[in-house]
């Protein structure tokens, strides 16, 4: 706004140029021009009825002040009523003072629907946006769910409620099965850390060889050897429990007691012991190698499969420590420390966790773990249903069978029978004999079929989804490992992280410059709404 002071008389105008009449602009006229508005004037920085020129994601429109005044609570309504340029700038992303145009870096498709809202007062849902993106856009422009049209409100609310679990119900759709780009990006970011590490290329190749069976021929051989060692360890543990080996160890223990030595010092079969030592050496090599080659030590200890590897070798070393504590003492000393042998037996039982090492090489086991992780609610509901049913039918069976000597002596004793019956296992070790007891057993079995089937269906759907998703993710990572990962990581080996960031900024500036050169010098005249 220009302020003119002519011979003591002040003139103000909103125009950038003011043409004074000839008498006022004649010779000897004193004119004072100022570009700042007078503080004591009530004139706004823009006219209240002036059309609002906006640019939303490249879509330019002129919005009438009358249409915006109908909805003063929206962002554009508040922008139209802004009292100053500073207040208006806080409501938009950028403002071009020369063109008097407000810029918003938002979705242009939603903006077209927003224009329809200012015309009709109703907002319609866009199929091109998911419910969450649509809700974010509506919140940004100051719209609530109450402005949704009646034809779209029910559909929007239904999609918003069912979207988090859509992959359970429609798991066959490609969008629910295909791996997310972020999942592959996580793998890329992990591998990119080798660029700044010492011997990064060698460590990267060794890491991919151990972690990805489809990376190369050596990785496939390594995977086969690892699976064979795990199976051999499990087989040795099972063979050790056979009666022949148990009788041999019992005879050796009797001979040790007769000789005045502790029976805990009896050693296992030499062949099985050597096989056990070999398996432990291989497992220790795997754990230590993965720890040394891991791109992130913190993430290594947070990964469930790595924790399983550690637990698989931990019992052996704990047994060695217990053996050192027991010592090789004889007589009374060995008897005093003999109770520590029970601890050794507990440590040996922990060897059963080695079977979980197969999860590293099995998509099904990993999918099962992911299913249990994301199905804790359904598992909790299943246990709650079983607990209620077992408690009810156990009390009924105890009341009907307590006079009979068939094992229903107490309600806690009936819990075993109720659990076996509700899960339709039916061992038959305890059965009712009275008519009332048999009716209670029939109700328990039918109730178990209904109760167990409901959550199991949901858990099965989740397992199917995670299995297909895991297979798709492995295929995507395997395909990208051969060429895309090699190109990415080769560039990482040559430049540092700072250089990568600089190159990204330069490329972004170049793209911006290209867009500016391609843009027309005169913007098209926006449409009026």
Curated annotation (Swiss-Prot):
Pfam families: BTB_2, Ion_trans. Residues 240-270, 323-340, 399-411, 432-438 are extracellular. GO terms for biological process: action potential; potassium ion transport; protein homooligomerization; regulation of potassium ion transmembrane transport. A motif (Selectivity filter) lies at residues 424-429. Gene3D superfamilies: 1.10.287.70, Potassium Channel Kv1.1, Chain A, Voltage-gated potassium channels. Chain C. Heterotetramer with KCNB1. Heterotetramer with KCNB2. Does not form homomultimers. Potassium channel regulatory subunit that modulate the delayed rectifier voltage-gated potassium channel activity of KCNB1 and KCNB2 by altering their kinetics, expression levels, and shifting the half-inactivation potential to more polarized values. While it does not form functional channels on its own, it can form functional heterotetrameric channels with KCNB1 and KCNB2. Each regulatory subunit has unique regulatory properties that can lead to extensive inhibition, significant changes in kinetics, and/or substantial shifts in the voltage dependencies of the inactivation process. This is Delayed-rectifier potassium channel regulatory subunit KCNS1. It comes from Colobus guereza.
């Amino acid at each position: 706004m220009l302020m003119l002071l002519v011979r003591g008389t002040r003139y103000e105008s909103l125009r950038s140029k003011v043409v004074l009449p000839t008498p006022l602009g004649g010779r000897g006229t004193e004119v004072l021009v100022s570009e700042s508005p007078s503080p004591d004037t009530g004139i706004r920085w823009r006219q209240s009825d002036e059309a609002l020129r906006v640019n939303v994601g490249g879509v330019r429109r002129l919005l009438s002040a009358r249409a915006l005044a109908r909805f003063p609570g929206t962002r554009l309504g508040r922008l139209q009523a802004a009292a100053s340029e500073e207040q208006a700038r806080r409501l938009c992303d950028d403002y071009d003072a020369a063109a008097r145009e407000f810029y918003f870096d938002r979705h242009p498709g939603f903006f077209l629907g927003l224009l329809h809202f200012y015309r009709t007062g109703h907002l319609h849902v866009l199929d091109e946006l998911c419910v969450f993106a649509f809700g974010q856009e509506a919140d940004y422009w100051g719209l609530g769910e109450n402005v949704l049209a009646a034809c779209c409100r029910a559909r929007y609310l239904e999609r918003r409620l069912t979207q988090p679990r859509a992959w359970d119900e429609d798991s066959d759709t490609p969008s629910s099965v295909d791996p997310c780009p972020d999942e592959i990006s996580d793998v890329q970011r992990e591998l990119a850390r080798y660029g700044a590490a010492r011997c990064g290329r060698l460590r990267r190749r060794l890491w991919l060889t151990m972690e990805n069976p489809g990376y190369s021929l050596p990785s496939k051989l390594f995977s086969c050897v690892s699976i064979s060692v795990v199976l051999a360890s499990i087989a040795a543990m099972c063979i050790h429990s056979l009666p022949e080996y148990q009788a041999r160890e019992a005879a050796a223990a009797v001979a040790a007691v007769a000789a005045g030595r502790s029976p805990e010092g009896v050693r296992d079969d030499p062949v099985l012991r050597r096989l056990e030592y070999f398996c432990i050496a291989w497992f220790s090599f795997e754990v230590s190698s993965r720890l040394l080659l891991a791109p992130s030590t913190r993430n290594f200890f947070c990964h469930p499969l790595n924790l399983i590897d550690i637990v698989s070798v931990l019992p052996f070393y704990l047994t060695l420590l217990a053996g050192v504590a027991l010592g090789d003492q004889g007589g009374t000393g060995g008897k005093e420390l003999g109770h520590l042998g029970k601890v050794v037996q507990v440590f040996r039982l922990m060897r059963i966790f080695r079977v979980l090492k197969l999860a590293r090489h099995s998509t099904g086991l990993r999918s099962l773990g992911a299913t249990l992780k994301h199905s804790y609610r359904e598992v909790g509901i299943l246990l709650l249903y079983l607990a209620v049913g077992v408690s009810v039918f156990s009390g009924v069976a105890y009341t009907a069978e307590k006079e009979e000597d068939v094992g229903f002596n107490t309600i806690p004793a009936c819990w075993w029978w109720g659990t076996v019956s509700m899960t339709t296992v039916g061992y038959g070790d305890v059965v009712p004999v009275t008519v009332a007891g048999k009716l209670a057993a029939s109700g328990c079995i039918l109730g178990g079929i209904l109760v167990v089937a409901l959550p199991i269906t949901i858990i099965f759907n989740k397992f199917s989804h995670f299995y297909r998703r895991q297979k798709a993710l492995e295929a995507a990572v395997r395909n990208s490992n051969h060429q895309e990962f090699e190109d990415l990581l080769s560039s990482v080996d040559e430049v540092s992280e700072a250089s990568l960031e600089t190159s990204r900024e330069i490329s972004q500036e170049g793209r911006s410059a290209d867009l500016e050169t391609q843009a027309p010098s005169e913007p098209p005249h926006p449409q009026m709404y």
